[in-house]
Amino acid sequence: FTILWNDGPRLQKLDEELKEKSLAPNQLGKGRNVWYCLGMSIARDTARSVALHDCDIKTYDRRMLAKLFYPVVNPVFNFEFCKGFYPRIANEKMNGRVARLLVAPLLIALEKTIGSSEYLQFMKSFKYPLSGEFSFRRNVLSELRISSDWGIEVGVLSEMQRNFSPNNICQVDLADTYDHKHQDLSLDDETKGLSKMSID
C-alpha cells in the first residue's frame, strides 16, 4: 500500500505543477485529497479496487474496511460501487444532523415540487447518503468527476447514478455503532463546520 502525504513536499510540488496548467483542485480538503488518491490509483493501474473512508472515525474497526471491499472484490458479484451506512446514534443522541435535517427533507421537498425522477429515487434509496465510506472497482475511477469540497459524497452518488445501472450499486451495513469527530454548527460563519458542509 501507499500513503499519500497531502501536505508533504512531493505532493505539494506536483500540486503546483498541475495548478500552473489549471488541472489541480483549488480547494483544500477531502475532495482534493480523494482526487489525488484516485489519480494515483489510475496512474499506477495496479489496484483492482479502491475504498475510501473518513479518517475521523472514533469507533473504527478494521472489519469496516473488509465489509466495504467485499461486494466489489468478490468476483461472484457484479457490483461496481458500494456505499457504507451505519446508525448515527451515539451517547444516547441522534447524530447525522446534515443528512437528517437537510438532505432527507430536501429530497422529499424536491420530489413534491418537481415530481419523482430516477435521480431523486436513487438518492433517496441510500440509508445514509452522506457516509464518507465507499468502494469502487478500478474501472469506475476514470468515469468519475470528483467534487473538491464537502459535496464529495453527494457528488460521487450522482456520478454513480449517471454512469452505472442501479444493479451495479450496493449498500453495506458497516457497524452497529459509529461515531466520529463532529463538526461545529458554525451559525455565524458559513465558511466552517456544518454551515459550509450544508452549502457545499
Model segments located where?
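Conserved nucleotide-sugar donor-binding catalytic segment
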Residues: 144-148
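Short glycine/serine/threonine-enriched helix-capping/active-site loop
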Residues: 6, 82-85, 172
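Short beta-strand-to-loop acidic/aromatic patch adjacent to the donor-nucleotide binding site
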Residues: 44-58
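Conserved nucleotide-sugar donor-binding
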Residues: 104-114, 127-143
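A recurrent flexible, glycine/aromatic-enriched loop bordering the glycosyltransferase active site
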Residues: 90-97, 114-133
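C-terminal catalytic/acceptor-binding lobe
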Residues: 150-200
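Conserved donor-nucleotide/metal-binding helix-loop-beta segment in metal-dependent transferases, i.e.
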Residues: 58-88
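Active-site-proximal specificity loops/subdomain of glycosyltransferases
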Residues: 1-45
